[in-house]
């Protein structure tokens, strides 16, 4: 319900709804297009290599292109999928090939990203349109797994979020500003949750924006 299709249906039916419109929902659901927008803002994010499903027919060439860019480990993601479905971490070539095939089950556009070592944090954003955009304080995700995958989000009771964590440098001030800028750039309205990593030196790295956050938020 957050990729713009339901929003478009509601608009055609002239039914009011809460949250982002068609454009913001569709763009934010597509990780590749979100990255292109965030690149334009000059906000740091994980380096990435886009891969199309049809390129997996020549797996050796595709994997070699990725390996020429990144060292292991890397993360593989479908461009359009929520709740971390189809996301995997690869420590070697065999795991990368398996991860690409799994991600391709969920979407024809894939992303392979460098691994960012840091704390996972999130920031809520409200407003948009004619209203002032306001960002919340920062929450930190304490995942009970190697990374915050589908099972860690929904099935592992050890995963939790803490509010107002102590962060290095001026990360706590940077994050709300960056979250509001990204929300505005995708034409957000109503509410969204913007996720980041914070590295040990205080550097803030954008992860993704969720225009209709789940109950883990």
Question: How would you label these PLM feature ranges?
Answer:
Residues 84, 141-144, 210-217:
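Glycine-rich phosphate/pyrophosphate-binding beta-alpha loops
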Residues 1-29, 44-52:
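A short, GP-enriched loop/loop-strand-helix hinge that lies immediately N-terminal to
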Residues 91-170, 177, 203-205:
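Phosphate-binding site of ATP-dependent enzymes
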Residues 10, 114, 183-215:
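Conserved metal-phosphate-binding beta-hairpin within the catalytic cores
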Residues 137-139, 178-185, 189:
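Active-site anion/phosphate-binding pocket segments in diverse small-molecule metabolic enzymes
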Residues 27-113, 117-119, 129:
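Active-site nucleotide/adenylate-binding loops and adjacent lid/helix of ATP-dependent enzymes
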Residues 1, 79-81, 212:
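Short glycine-rich anion-binding loops that position phosphate/pyrophosphate groups of nucleotides
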């Amino acid at each position: 319900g957050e990729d713009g299709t339901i929003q478009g249906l509601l608009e055609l039916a002239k039914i009011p709804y809460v949250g982002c419109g068609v454009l913001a929902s569709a763009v934010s659901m597509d990780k590749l297009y979100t990255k292109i927008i965030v690149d334009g803002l000059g906000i740091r994010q994980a380096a990435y290599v886009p891969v199309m499903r049809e390129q997996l027919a020549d797996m050796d060439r595709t994997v070699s292109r990725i390996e020429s860019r990144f060292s292991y480990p890397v993360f593989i993601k479908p461009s359009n999928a929520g709740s971390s479905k189809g996301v995997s971490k690869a420590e070697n070539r065999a795991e990368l090939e398996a991860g690409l095939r799994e991600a391709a089950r969920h979407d024809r556009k894939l992303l392979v990203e460098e691994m960012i070592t840091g704390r996972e944090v999130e920031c809520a954003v409200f407003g948009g349109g004619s209203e002032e955009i306001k960002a919340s304080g920062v929450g930190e995700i304490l995942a009970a797994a190697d990374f915050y995958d589908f099972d860690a989000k929904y099935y592992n009771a050890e995963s939790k979020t803490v509010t107002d964590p102590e962060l290095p440098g001026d990360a706590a001030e940077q994050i709300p500003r960056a979250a509001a800028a990204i929300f505005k750039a995708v034409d957000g309205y109503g509410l969204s949750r913007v996720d980041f990593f914070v590295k040990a030196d205080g550097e803030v790295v954008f992860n993704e924006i969720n225009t209709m956050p789940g109950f883990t938020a």
